């Protein structure tokens, strides 16, 4: 599996509870926080839910 770097670029304030939980599951919480994750189908699904809040790079 490929590793991707996920960076949160938009605040979670005034976002739905589901989107906040997805960000927490990814290991994000504050603006400009970054994590590296394996690109599994479950991570892809989470990224689809919060694609307007994060930037994904290879």
Curated annotation (Swiss-Prot):
Gene Ontology CC, one term: cytosolic large ribosomal subunit
GO biological process, one term: translation
This protein's UniProt keywords: Ribonucleoprotein, Ribosomal protein
CDD domains membership: Ribosomal_L30
PANTHER family xrefs: LARGE RIBOSOMAL SUBUNIT PROTEIN UL30M, MITOCHONDRIAL RIBOSOMAL PROTEIN L30
Family, as annotated: Belongs to the universal ribosomal protein uL30 family.
UniProt-recorded name of the protein: Large ribosomal subunit protein uL30
Species annotation: Cytophaga hutchinsonii (strain ATCC 33406 / DSM 1761 / CIP 103989 / NBRC 15051 / NCIMB 9469 / D465)
Upper taxonomic lineage: Bacteria, Pseudomonadati, Bacteroidota, Cytophagia, Cytophagales
């Amino acid at each position: 599996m490929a590793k991707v770097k996920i960076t949160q670029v938009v605040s979670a304030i005034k976002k739905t509870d589901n989107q906040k939980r997805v960000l927490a599951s990814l290991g994000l919480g504050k603006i400009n926080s970054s994590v590296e994750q394996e690109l599994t189908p479950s991570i892809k699904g989470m990224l689809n839910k919060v694609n307007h809040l994060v930037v994904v790079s290879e």
